[in-house]
Amino acid sequence: MDCVLRSYLLLAFGFLICLFLFCLVVFIWFVYKQILFRTTAQSNEARHNHSTVV
């Protein structure tokens, strides 16, 4: 019984680790997309301001 319980705990622990890694990857991808979008928006805005000044 102890061996079965240990295998179940190991399976649950592995599932939690996979879930945590998946959430981490999604969070990093979301933050990277936000930063990328913000930098492109700033560059477009700077280019627009530069064209209006000239």
From Swiss-Prot:
UniProt-listed GO biological process terms: transport of virus in host, cell to cell
Result after altering residue 18 to A: No effect on homodimerization. Reduces virus ability to move from cell to cell
Stretches of the chain found on the membrane's Cytoplasmic side: 32-54
Compartment annotation: Host rough endoplasmic reticulum membrane
Topology feature Lumenal, residues: 1-10
Lipid bilayer topology: Single-pass type III membrane protein
Effect of mutating residue 38 to A: Reduces virus ability to move from cell to cell
Gene Ontology, cellular component aspect: host cell rough endoplasmic reticulum membrane; membrane
Regions that span the bilayer: 11-31
Taxonomic superkingdom: Viruses
Keywords: Disulfide bond, Host endoplasmic reticulum, Host membrane, Membrane, Transmembrane, Transmembrane helix, Transport, Viral movement protein
UniProt cross-references to InterPro entries, sorted A to Z: Beet_yellows_virus_p6 (IPR009591)
Quaternary state and interactors: Homodimer; disulfide-linked.
Its job: Transports viral genome to neighboring plant cells directly through plasmosdesmata, without any budding. The movement protein allows efficient cell to cell propagation, by bypassing the host cell wall barrier. Two movement proteins, p6, Hsp70h and three structural proteins, CP, CPm, and P64 are essential for cell-cell movement. Also plays a role in virion formation. Together with CPm and p64, encapsidates the 5'-terminal portion of the viral genome.
Protein name: Movement protein p6
Organism: Beet yellows virus (isolate Ukraine) (BYV)
